[in-house]
């Protein structure tokens, strides 16, 4: 039986991967205005609106019916499906997928325990496993183990958006705001951790490199993806240059993409993100 990959729209993917999967969108709200993530608003338009608007956007999870629509398509095509969602600790989207899956056979829901590029690299690994001829169940079993090794580290321009979205405490946000320092965060096992605070992007970039080393380094045999939030990729390109010893001779090409609307709502513009499987 052929297997398709279904993901929610918070998984940040490069175009060639995006073409191979089926996406269930979440919803972004600017006040009374409602947008379907990746459908009625693209990343560029979202960040332009985020920067210009006085209204903090909010997000809504995908519903069981949203997933059921995709599951029905898989059923009609005679295909099994592996469903990869953002961390259940961040959103009820995973729960929605599980509720919908209860009405279908051969649907396997995986809580990525990650977000953005972290979910994205798990999707890439899923496609790789299927391309290698793994069965649906074999692929699911491997993915459930490998997701424990996903590390996402991010240098944010500010903690303000995370605070306003209720993702971190006001005390942590205040600490990040002192002297306009840039916070370095990690996402592991569905939780956000403040790793350190840097005065300026260069020190922040050094902290990102330090955290990669702290977790034991990168498994270069598995997918790696970098990302940025906002309209310009200049900060990310500066990070790549500053951290060149990590990548030199190990990657033919450093791949990166933009952080999508839903996660961008909480990260704000000006973030640099690195997602990888640790050794």
What are these regions (language model features)?
Residues 1-4, 80:
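Short active-site oxyanion
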Residues 3-4, 10-18, 22-27, 32-33, ...:
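Mixed-charge interfacial surface used for oligomerization/domain docking
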Residues 35-103:
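Class I S-adenosyl-L-methionine
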Residues 60-61, 111-113:
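Short beta->alpha junction loops
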Residues 85-88, 113, 230:
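Conserved residues at beta->alpha junctions
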């Amino acid at each position: 039986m052929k297997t398709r990959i279904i993901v929610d729209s918070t998984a940040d993917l490069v175009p060639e991967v995006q073409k191979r999967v089926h996406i269930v969108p979440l919803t972004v709200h600017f006040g009374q205005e409602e947008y379907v993530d990746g459908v009625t608003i693209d990343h560029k338009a979202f960040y332009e609106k985020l920067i210009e608007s006085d209204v903090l956007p909010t997000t809504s999870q995908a519903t069981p019916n949203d997933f059921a629509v995709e599951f029905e398509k898989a059923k009609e095509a005679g295909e099994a499906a592996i469903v990869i969602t953002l961390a259940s600790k961040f959103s009820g989207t995973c729960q929605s997928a599980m509720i919908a899956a209860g009405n279908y056979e051969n649907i396997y829901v995986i809580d990525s325990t990650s977000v953005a590029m972290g979910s994205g690299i798990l999707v890439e690994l899923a496609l790789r496993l299927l391309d290698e001829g793994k069965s649906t169940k074999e692929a699911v079993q491997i993915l459930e183990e490998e997701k424990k090794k996903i590390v996402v580290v991010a240098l944010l321009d500010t903690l303000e958006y995370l605070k306003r979205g209720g993702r971190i405490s006001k005390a942590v946000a205040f600490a990040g705001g002192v002297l306009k320092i840039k916070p370095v965060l990690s996402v592991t096992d569905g939780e956000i951790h403040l790793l350190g605070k840097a005065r300026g992007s260069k020190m922040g970039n050094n902290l990102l490199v330090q955290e990669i080393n702290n977790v034991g380094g990168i498994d270069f045999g598995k997918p790696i993806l970098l990302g940025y939030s906002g309209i310009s990729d200049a900060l990310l390109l500066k990070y790549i240059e500053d951290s060149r010893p990590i990548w030199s001779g190990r990657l033919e090409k450093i791949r990166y993409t933009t952080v999508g609307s839903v996660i961008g709502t909480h990260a704000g513009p000006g973030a640099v993100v690195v997602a990888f499987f640790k050794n």
